[in-house]
UniProtKB/Swiss-Prot annotation:
Its main location: cytoplasm. GO terms for cellular component: axon; cytoplasmic vesicle; dendrite. The keyword Coiled coil applies. It comes from Mus musculus. This is NEDD4-binding protein 3.
Length: 537
């Protein structure tokens, strides 16, 4: 490669040599792309253009030494030499240099720029910050490399030229990004990106390489070199290449729909799917275990509540017993206390008297007892009403049995009259028997036979009448016993009610006395008022 040395001692070639140094043989291309993936994706579809690994392997292909490479002589002017002569402070134009703020200071590309992003997008952010810092005017830099691609030097083979065209399409991506989906004429594959996506981190990092040609285009040129470059810059822009883009918000929004569709597809499949059966079995096991744990926990909570309730009841009972014992002791002390004689002694005995709180507590207790007696009275009245209703029903049954007995007595009287009439008719038929003939004798025999049948019927009626009388007497006896029992119950209930009313009145009088004593305790004691005796309960 023909180079010239400037003041800084940096090697530099022509603009055409920038692409000529990338030439390599088909064997080198095959060796570089051998370790990459095939032309199909895991789902069986064709891949779009070059992948990241293939593109990186292309960038890192071994280059031939420029000093040993033989090239055919060219007659076109050396634009780099002319530019360097006019701009002595220019920097390095080699493959590892990058422009910065319009100056060609030496800036090497670190290998981390071309590493694929890993993790949660931290690499993407670093690339985007690099592009925002150094690539504010990168959208102008595509023209020079596109013009260079339109007139490529001699290449070893068609496959290398095709790979170079794909590389140039990847390098020609703007900072803002073109509108999606135009076809690549050189590679034959359709490239595009989703609408609404911003510049990818990879395209941002490659913008510095594209900026090299743009810087050369923006440099001042001599009249000799402006002609060929003007012709090259008049060529049309190539179609936008494929851009490596990260998932966008629209793609993320489509994910739930895809998940639902996958669930529907799984649901439409055969029920005997082993994966679905395993999931359902695990779900059933989890539900059963959860229910069992819930029942056990509920049982433990119920047992704990029962234990706490029993403990509270026991404590309440013990407190009531202690209260009764203390009240008995207090009453015993009050009964054994000597009666005061003078007002001075009564004033001294006042601190030992029953306190106001204890009197209030006794009033509350008596009120509770009164309410309990009222409840018992209401229960006794309800029971009395029930007994009265039963007595009324028994009286109704007694009336019915009496009416039935009267009907039976009427039937019995009728039967008696029939028997008497039959007995009176029998002697009348036997009286004219002295002058009877054979026919009369035969008739008399028939009459005797009929009389015997009547007597048997009368005896049967007498037996039935006797049974009915005995049954009526038994019913009357049972009714009398039941009436006596109900009378005793009624007297007992009335006596109990009178006792309850009497105890209620006694309790009311005691309550009035306690309230009066409480009022006296609340009033300030005077020297001339005598001390009232507390009523004994």
């Amino acid at each position: 490669m023909a180079t010239t040395s400037g003041p800084a001692g940096i090697a530099m070639g022509s603009v055409g040599s920038l692409l000529e140094r990338q030439d390599f043989s088909p064997e080198e291309l095959r060796a570089a792309l051998a370790g990459s993936r095939g032309s199909r994706q895991p789902d069986g579809l064709l891949r779009k253009g070059l992948g990241q690994r293939e593109f990186f392997s292309y960038l890192h292909l071994p280059k031939k030494d420029g000093k040993t490479t033989k090239r055919a002589p060219r007659n076109e002017p050396d634009y780099a030499t002319l530019y360097y002569r006019e701009h002595p402070r220019a920097g390095d134009f080699s493959k590892t240099s990058l422009p910065e703020r319009g100056r060609f200071d030496k800036c090497r590309i670190r290998p981390s720029v071309f590493k694929p992003p890993v993790g949660s997008g931290k690499g993407f952010l670093s690339m985007q910050s690099l592009a925002a810092h150094k690539g504010q005017k990168l959208w102008r830099s595509n023209g020079s490399l596109h013009t260079l691609a339109c007139h490529p030097p001699l290449s070893p083979g068609p496959r290398a030229s095709q790979a170079r065209a794909q590389l140039l399409h990847a390098l020609s991506l703007d900072e803002g990004g073109p509108e999606p989906s135009l076809s690549d004429s050189s590679s034959g594959g359709s490239f595009g990106r989703s609408p609404g996506t911003g510049p990818s981190p990879f395209s941002s990092s490659l913008g510095h390489i594209n900026h090299l040609g743009g810087s050369l285009d923006r440099a001042p040129r001599s009249p000799k070199e402006s002609g060929p470059l003007a012709v090259l810059s008049c060529l049309p822009e190539p179609p936008p290449p494929y851009e490596f883009s990260c998932p966008t918000t629209e793609e993320v929004a489509v994910l739930p729909e895809a998940r639902e569709e996958l669930k529907r597809d799984l649901g439409d499949q055969d029920v005997s799917n082993s994966f679905t059966q395993v999931l359902e079995e695990r779900q059933r096991l989890w539900l059963s275990e959860l229910k069992r744990l819930y029942v056990e926990r509920l049982h433990e909570v119920a047992q704990k509540a029962e234990r706490s309730e029993r403990n509270l009841q026991l404590q309440l009972f013990m407190a009531q017993q202690e209260q009764r014992r203390l009240r008995k002791e207090l009453r015993a002390q009050q009964g054994l206390a000597p009666e005061p004689r003078t007002s001075g002694s009564s004033m001294e005995a006042d601190p030992n008297a029953r306190p106001e709180e204890e009197a209030r507590w006794e009033v509350c207790q008596k009120t509770a007892e009164i309410s309990l007696l009222k409840q018992q009275l209401r229960e006794a009245q309800a029971e009395l009403a029930q007994k009265l209703a039963e007595i009324f029903s028994l009286k109704t049954q007694l009336r019915g049995s009496r009416a039935q007995a009267q009907a039976q007595d009427a039937e019995l009287a009728r039967l008696r009259e029939a028997v008497h009439s039959l007995q009176e008719q029998a002697p009348r038929e036997e009286a004219p028997g002295s002058c009877e003939t054979d026919d009369c004798k035969s008739r008399g025999l028939l009459g005797e036979a009929g009389g015997s049948e009547a007597r048997e019927g009368a005896e049967q009626l007498r037996a039935e009448l006797l049974q009915e009388r005995l049954r009526g007497q038994e019913q009357a006896l049972r009714f009398e016993q039941e009436r006596q029992t109900w009378q005793e119950e009624k007297e007992r209930v009335l006596r109990y009610q009178r006792e309850i009313q009497g105890s209620y009145m006694d309790m009311y009088r005691r309550n009035q006395a306690l309230e009066h004593e409480l009022r006296l305790l609340r009033e300030p004691p005077t020297s001339w008022s005598p001390r009232l005796e507390s009523s004994k309960i």
